[in-house]
Swiss-Prot record:
Native species: Saccharomyces cerevisiae (strain ATCC 204508 / S288c) (Baker's yeast)
Binding site for ATP: D969, D970, M971, G972, L973, G974, K975, T976
Subunit structure: Interacts with CDC3, CDC11, EBP2, SIR4, UBC4 and SUMO/SMT3.
Record-stated family: Belongs to the SNF2/RAD54 helicase family.
UniProt protein name: ATP-dependent helicase ULS1
Locations listed in the record: Nucleus
Lineage: Eukaryota, Fungi, Dikarya, Ascomycota, Saccharomycotina
Keyword Transferase: no
Length: 1619
């Protein structure tokens, strides 16, 4: 039976102050009426004399004694008088014994023979106990005399109580007398801090020291200290144990008295009185001075008492004794005592007269022991009334007795359960089998733990030596585990005892406080009552007052004693805690060494066996070669035999053998799941799965291994808790976790633990939900509720203080301070206080459990704050664990761990199925495109062949499980007409869900409406509606939208609707929510009076959603992108000729909208694709990684995309019979003064740019862009640079001439801008695009909307205010100005609060003060006076044409010379370039022209395009790149001039295709003007890189190669299987 750690609840419950009772928590203790028992014994005249000698004494616990007719004894143990777990009897000094004998001689009478027997031997008193019974009459004088002496003795003890040592004053359980001495369950011999653990269980020499030493020390005590001796009751006798020999005459007896005498030879119980007396005399003579175990009592020799007490507790052991072993039938007085048929447990104490052999045989039993009584809680056994088996004498030196006496130790540490009979080790060890558990138990009890673990044997040793080494290591490991278990049990018992004593002392201290308080109240009450009457105080009253005051002083002294003892116990617990840490450290080192040696030996043994087998095969092969040479073997037979041998050799490869060995040994040393550290388990599983991963390179694996080790290092450092965790260590752990998560290593338990240990993750997906945010949110909500409650102010302050303690605790952790024991105790008290106040924050409380904080009053009382840090570690509740210490190598467990941690390329089952379904679509794409659909009857035009093929593909996809895809045909192939054909070919049959939603840029909406009106027959009754704009362009309800067949809306308008629909409760929490919220969940947070957009109602489900120019949602963070992805629709389509323009992340936004699983989840997309294309120092991927990612992109696009270029052919013919397009690059170099100007500007700007880039201050990035802009302008014309600089100099800092009303007002407006608005300024600076005209911004001529942070051109401010003030969202302010909505985000800005970017830069980036601003104001006023006189106006007449102007004029002149009708489109990013070009076209060449720029309103733009088509004289169109690169059809022109290169090559291609599309009948010529040896060279290089990346993924030829891959190859590419 396993030994249970002892918890001693030491409670004094006696009339005498020197008696202790220790209750073990492993038993059920019945209430004991000790006083009643004492009274019975005294009334019966039972007095127990003790010898003057201080040697050990024999005693018997007797409740009631009688002699039956058959002269046998029977012990009747009443339930109400059950003996306690351990009775601490006081050891009497020589002085005490003499006084006691004098008293007893007076009491017992003058019988000569009997008195001599009592005086000469302690056996006499024992014999008298057997003779006394109820029938013996007692004289009244004797009773009176006895009672008087008892009272006198009690008074004497009470008088001496103040002189007794404070460490050994006992406490009556009812609070009558003094306190108890806490149990010292481990003595000084247990030195746990030794580096080399003594685990041999050999007794210390101090334990068997000569008792004469104690006698001498006792004789030297101060006799004056003890003035009274209490009457000895049955509890005063020393408890001793023995086993009983049985005789045949006792088998039928009914009554027994169990003698508990622990000595070498057990005496036989006498069958009659004389035999009893002689036996007692003989045994007393044998053990005199040796057998008694002294118990702590009222003595002043503290050092001696502590030594004896520690020795006693060291040998306490719970020893169950089966009742069936007794030869007598034991009965209870009360029938209910043994109703549960339990096992009787008897108290056992060690005897010091045992010889060395006997003690050794029982040493392991006595090492960790406690006194055990009869328990109703133990295992059920035979009933008491049914047991009549004879008692058999056990031989203490037999092997059976040894095995039965050694208690089983249940290990509470995380010791691995190693099956040393595992097949792998058995196979490696050969015929040398491992010893059985029974044999090992016998051998291990006497063996000594070896100091060091055997090292690895040489690789060339023989097989026999390897097997021998392995067997030795197995045995050593078994002994190591056993010894560690033993040592652990010792430590845990010590800690448990100290912990229990601390608990009791705390209870007693609280009781002492109450007693002092009650006594003080009583004393004050007496004083008050006597003072109230005004009469003289009588002597009786004075006695009462004095007695009350004395009682109060005594109670205060007792309280102080208890406090001192509690401090002493806590100090002991701290020492044990340090010993525990040292033990755990040494345990881990020893285990690791042992396991490593065991693994190496097993591997080497197998390797040796493999080498021997290979040598045998090679020898056979040589023999066959010799036989073939000699001609004794035919060639066919030789070939067959050598083939078999070669197959054996192939099967015996050492490399494979090593891998197999390691994998097979690992399950052997694997710990039970329930007892392993789940954090370490997660890390180990991640490493294991990474090792098995086939799609990662070795370099990547090594990097990830290093990051996993960083996390383990941080965890260990935090849990050690000895010092502050520095910022660098936390940063390393944070970066490692981020990189691992990005690389697909998903370990929820690890990341949650790191967050709880103070790591703050910027990516909310790593820990979702955010436990840290929930922690502080709970506290904030609790504060709010308490402040609004009706509780008293005192209660509110108390609760607030508790909440502050819990909040500060977590803040300390986030700062890098690990929790200390004192902090845990303080937070535990706060939690208990909150619970008592009724605050239910269960999640918060459970989160605190991770830091081992008690959350209930019971836990707070029971758990000492000094208990070891890593004791009782429990796994999280959501971890499904099945304890299995035997079979830990099952495949099911390995698979569950893979799914549990979601390591990269080991997807969850759902992701795997989704990827397989996606790969099925890859194989179907070829067959789908083979078909051809007919043109719908409701169309007014016939579809071209490639369009019919496209329509067939679109219809097939809608009939599949994908329900949508990407139509990425080249510009001009008719994506719009194919989409219209799809809407007509697959119209909805349900009137409730028939609406097609078409989202497009504003400039394209009119084109769509026109196409629908002209391409669809009227009989189709296909209704359309444009949502937005002025007039009746908006509806409020979904039912109004659902009436139309097609609803057209711009991206900007849809984003505004999403913004207005957003619940007010979630304002400011967008970043904490999913990027694509669920509409129904979102609407639950709205109130009835909020705005409901018809696009986002619960019933809003469109039949089909089409995104034209889908690249507009490429930024996943924009509101337009989120709005498009949130809308519900049955079918979802993206139309875009350039779905990828800058990075692979742009593709994710489209996948997210299409909801293609599993890559619609950002984590999955980044894991397999996105992360390999990021340029960051954190992500170190080689070319092979990127190639694999590109293959995945092609597979993905092949499954969801249809892309055809104009060069593609069908049946040998191109898709479109278009004339050719010729792209010419007209390269030139700067010369003369222009070259000097550019060179000087470049040198100056390079120096400034270097300085700015090295400066990390805000605003430096925009300054670098300005310098780069100047270089690009210089390539076009040097005058552009001058105009830009003059504009910058003349830029107004603020409108208005009043410093207070204008400048200072705007200054404060900027300083009060929200953080979100300031962040938006930085975002707008990155794009350098005006939100109104979409033109490129010029830093010297742009302003900031203070309400939202968007940037706008100075020239666009007036039209923006004019149009926006007419919108219904605009509001008129008190001053008459309008608060107008931003076109992009709908946030309001007062028209007078639009500030220049120059002022914003001065205030935010340069940190201007009011004084600086005033100085700038004065300088500005002077500049304005000068500028009024000298306003810079370019002198166009004196301007010389630049190289770019000359190139442009040459192209125009050549075109005009070759044709009288051909028209030209000229694209540029700089509208100021058009001003210079206009001068030369108008004045020098006299060529008419038109201009199309973003500052024009929609009507003006439309008029320009119509005039360009109709007027044959207007052959030149100047068009800005931003305003006209998409949405326009300009096939009336066939010449395109690109003046300056744009960052994005696809923007240029879109501009070119404005005229190269369907209906173009002329050859198209593209003229790209280029300046060599300038900044345009570097822009061209950037274009080339972007184009290579996109083309590598979008190349139709490479995408088609995917179709040649088999199913297995595709699965391998995505990590689903091996090749």
């Amino acid at each position: 039976m396993a030994a249970v750690p002892t918890i001693d609840l030491t409670l004094a419950d006696s009339d005498n102050e020197d008696i202790f009772h220790s209750f073990s928590s492993s038993t059920s203790v019945d209430k004991i009426d000790i006083r009643k028992e004492n009274g019975k014994l005294r009334m019966a005249g039972l007095e127990v004399a003790q010898s003057n000698d201080d040697a050990a004494r024999q005693a018997f616990h007797v409740f009631k004694t009688n002699i039956s007719n058959n002269e046998t004894f029977d012990t009747i143990l009443s339930k109400s008088k059950t003996i306690t777990d351990s009775t601490f009897n006081n050891e009497k000094s020589s002085n005490e014994v003499k006084q006691q004998q004098v008293l007893k001689e007076e009491t017992m009478g003058s019988s000569n023979d009997e008195k001599k027997t009592q005086e000469s031997s302690p056996s006499a008193e024992m014999i008298k106990l057997f003779y006394e019974n109820d029938d013996v009459p007692l004289s009244d004088s004797f009773k009176q005399k006895e009672e008087g002496k008892r009272i006198n003795q009690d008074e004497q003890v009470k008088e001496n109580i103040c002189g007794i040592s404070s460490s050994y004053v006992s406490k009556d359980y009812d609070g009558v007398e003094d306190d108890f001495e806490p149990n010292t369950c481990q003595d000084s011999n247990l030195d746990f801090q030794e580096e080399k653990l003594n685990l041999n269980n050999k007794p210390s020499q101090q334990q068997f020291s000569d008792p004469e030493t104690k006698d001498n020390s006792l004789k030297s005590e101060n006799k004056d200290q003890i003035k009274g001796v209490t009457t000895t009751s049955y509890r005063d006798l020393p408890i001793e144990s023995s086993a009983f020999q049985d005789s045949e005459t006792q088998n039928n007896s009914k009554n027994t008295i169990p003698n508990i005498v622990n000595e070498k030879r057990t005496p036989a119980l006498p069958s009659n009185l004389s035999s009893v007396e002689s036996s007692l005399k003989n045994e007393t003579a044998k053990v005199e001075g040796k057998t008694t175990v002294r118990l702590p009592g009222l003595q002043n020799n503290v050092a001696l008492l502590e030594q004896e007490q520690s020795e006693l507790f060291k040998h306490f052991s719970e020893q169950p004794v089966d009742i069936s072993d007794f030869g007598r039938k034991i009965k209870r007085k009360h029938s209910g005592d043994f109703a549960d048929n339990k096992i009787l447990k008897r108290p056992i104490l060690p005897s010091k007269n045992m010889d060395h052999t006997t003690h050794n045989s029982h040493d392991s039993e006595q090492k960790n022991s406690s006194i055990i009584i009869l328990s109703d809680e133990d295992e059920s056994g035979a009933g008491i009334n049914d047991i009549e088996s004879p008692l058999k004498v056990s031989e203490p030196n037999t092997a059976d007795a040894l095995r039965s006496s050694v208690p089983e130790v249940i290990s509470l540490l995380d010791l691995p359960n190693i099956d040393l009979n595992n097949s792998v080790i058995k196979e490696a060890s050969g015929s040398n089998s491992i010893p059985t558990s029974e044999t090992d138990a016998q051998s291990s009890s006497s063996s000594v733990l070896q100091g060091t673990i055997m090292t690895e044997q040489a690789t060339q040793s023989s097989q026999h030596e390897c097997n021998s080494s392995l067997d030795t290591l197995k045995k050593n490991h078994q002994k190591l585990l056993k010894d560690l278990n033993s040592r652990e049990s010792e430590l845990r018992n010590a800690l448990s005892c100290c912990k229990t004593n601390s608990e009791i002392l705390r209870r007693k201290l609280s009781r002492r406080e109450k007693e002092v308080s009650d006594a003080e109240k009583h004393w004050q009450l007496l004083l008050t009552s006597m003072a109230r009457g005004g009469r003289t105080i009588s002597s009786t009253q004075q006695i009462l007052v004095d007695e009350a005051e004395n009682q109060l002083n005594k109670l205060k002294e007792k309280r102080q004693l208890t406090k001192s003892k509690l401090d002493s116990i806590n100090l002991k617990m701290y020492n044990y805690n340090e010993q525990w840490k040292s033990f755990v450290h040494s345990k881990n080192i020893n285990l690791q060494k042992s396991l490593a040696a065991l693994e190496r030996s097993a591997r080497d043994s197998k390797a040796s066996a493999t080498v021997n087998k290979r040598n045998e095969c090679l020898a056979e092969k040589e023999k066959l070669d010799q036989m073939l040479k000699e001609g004794t073997l035919s060639f066919s037979t030789y070939k067959q035999l050598t083939g078999e041998i070669q197959q054996k050799l192939n099967d015996l490869k050492l490399g494979d053998q090593r891998t197999t060995d390691i994998n097979s040994v690992l399950p052997i040393v694997r710990q039970p799941l329930a007892k392993r550290d789940l954090f370490i388990k997660s890390i180990d599983t991640a490493k294991d799965l990474l090792a098995k991963n086939t799609s990662r390179t070795e370099m990547t694996k090594r990097i990830l291994y290093r990051h996993l080790d960083n996390l383990v290092s941080y965890k260990n450092f935090f849990e050690d808790g000895r010092s502050l965790i520095d910022i660098n260590r936390r940063h390393v752990a944070h970066e490692s976790a981020q990189i691992l998560f990005t690389n697909g290593v998903k370990m929820p338990i690890v990341f949650e633990t790191l967050q709880d240990y103070g790591i703050k993750f910027s990516n909310p997906a790593i820990v979702n939900p955010d436990r840290r945010a929930q922690y502080f949110k709970s506290i904030e909500v609790a504060r709010d509720l308490i402040s609004k409650s009706t509780r008293s102010e005192d209660a509110k302050r108390k609760i607030t203080r508790f909440l502050n303690i819990i909040e500060e605790f977590r803040k300390d952790i986030d700062t890098g301070f690990p929790p200390t024991p004192l902090k845990r105790e303080g937070v535990g008290k706060a939690v208990v206080g909150l619970r008592q106040q009724g605050l239910k924050m269960d999640r918060l409380y459970e989160n605190l459990r991770r830091y081992k904080i008690p959350i209930t009053s019971e836990e707070l009382l029971q758990q000492s704050y000094l208990f070891p840090v890593n004791a009782d570690q429990r796994p999280p509740s959501n971890w499904n664990i099945v304890e299995n210490t035997e079979d830990t190598s099952s495949t099911a467990n390995d698979l569950s761990m893979q799914d549990e941690f979601h390591i990269s390329n080991m997807h969850a089952a759902e992701d795997q199925e989704q990827i397989r379904a996606l790969l099925e679509n890859v194989k179907q794409s070829e067959s789908i495109i083979d078909g051809e659909a007919l043109t719908p009857e409701d169309m007014t035009v016939n579809l071209l062949k490639h369009q019919r093929l496209g329509l067939h593909w679109l219809l097939q996809v809608e009939n599949s499980a994908k329900k949508g895809g990407l139509l990425a045909d080249d510009m001009g192939l008719g994506k719009t007409i194919q989409a219209i054909a799809l809407m007509l070919a697959n119209r909805s049959e349900e009137s409730k869900c028939k609406t097609n939603l078409i989202v497009a840029p504003v400039s394209v909406l009119r084109v769509w409406k026109g196409e629908l009106e002209t391409k669809v027959k009227k009989r189709a009754k296909f209704t359309t509606f444009i949502f937005g704009g002025s007039g009746n362009g908006k509806v409020k309800h979904w039912r109004d939208l659902a009436r139309y067949d097609a609803v057209l809306v711009s991206y900007q308008t849809l984003a505004n609707e999403f913004k207005k629909h957003w619940p007010k409760k979630l304002d400011g929490e967008q970043n904490q929510l999913p990027a694509v919220p669920h509409i129904q969940a979102l609407n639950r947070l709205k109130t009835s009076n909020e705005y409901y957009s018809p696009f986002f109602c619960n019933d809003s489900t469109f039949y089909r959603i089409l995104l034209d120019e889908g690249q507009n949602i490429k930024n996943k963070n924009t509101r337009a992108s989120k709005a498009c992805c949130t809308i519900n629709g049955m079918y979802r389509w993206v139309l875009s000729g350039t779905p990828i323009q800058n990075s692979m992340d742009e593709l994710y936004s489209l996948i997210r909208f299409l909801r293609i699983p599993p890559y619609h989840k950002e984590q999955r997309f980044k894991l397999d694709i996105g992360r390999f294309f990021q340029r960051n120092k954190q992500y170190q991927y080689d070319n092979e990684d990127r190639k694999n990612a590109l293959r995945k992109v092609r597979v993905l696009l092949n499954a969801i995309m249809l892309r055809r270029s104009k060069a593609d052919k069908i049946d040998g013919k191109p898709l479109l019979e278009l004339p050719p397009k010729i792209v010419e690059v007209d390269e030139s170099r700067l010369k003369g003064e222009e070259l000097k100007f550019y060179t000087a500007l470049e040198s100056k700007n390079q120096a400034l740019a270097k300085k700015l880039l090295n400066n990390s201050t805000r605003g430096s990035y925009s300054s670098v862009l300005t310098l780069l802009l100047r270089l690009r302008q210089a390539c076009c014309h040097s005058e552009l640079v001058v105009m830009g600089e003059k504009k910058a100099e003349g830029t107004k800092v603020a409108n208005g001439k009043s410093f207070e009303d204008d400048w200072l007002r705007l200054y404060y407006k900027i300083t009060h801008m929200s953080g979100e608005a300031q962040a938006q300024v930085i975002t707008s600076m990155n794009s350098m695009t005006c939100f109104w005209c979409m033109e490129q911004l010029e830093p010297e001529a742009m302003s900031v909307l203070t309400g939202c942070g968007h940037l706008i051109c100075d020239t666009c401010i007036e039209p923006f205010i004019e149009e926006s003030s007419m919108l219904p969202q605009a509001k008129k302010t008190k001053g008459g100005a309008f608060a107008i909505p931003c076109k992009d985000c709908q946030r309001l800005t007062n028209e007078k609060d639009i500030v220049s970017h120059k002022l914003y830069d001065q205030v935010i980036n340069q940190g201007f003060t009011e004084e600086d601003l005033h100085a700038e104001y004065l300088s500005e006023m002077e500049k304005q006076k000068i500028q009024q006189k000298n306003v810079y106006v370019p002198n166009f007449e004196s301007l010389e044409p630049s190289t770019k102007i000359e190139q442009c004029i040459q192209v125009i002149q050549r075109v005009f010379d070759e044709s009288a009708t051909e028209k030209i489109i000229i694209f540029s990013q700089f509208t100021t370039f058009f001003e210079i070009l206009e001068h030369f076209l108008k004045n020098k060449l006299n060529f008419p022209y038109l201009k199309y720029i973003g500052s024009m309103n929609a009507q003006r733009r439309s008029d320009v395009i119509n005039e360009f088509y109709r007027d044959p004289e207007k052959r030149i169109l100047l068009i800005s790149m931003k305003a006209g690169n998409s949405g326009l059809t300009l096939t009336c022109a066939n010449h395109v001039v690109i003046v300056d290169p744009f960052w994005n090559p696809y923007v240029e291609e879109q501009a070119q295709d404005r005229c190269y599309r369907i209906s173009q009948t002329k050859k198209v010529q593209v003229h790209k003007l280029f300046i060599k040896d300038s900044v345009e060279d570097r822009i061209s290089e950037l274009q080339k890189r972007k184009k290579e990346m996109v083309d590598s993924a979008m190349d139709p030829g490479k995408i088609k190669e995917v179709n040649s891959l088999g199913r297995r190859e595709l699965g391998f590419l995505f990590g689903l299987n091996a090749l």
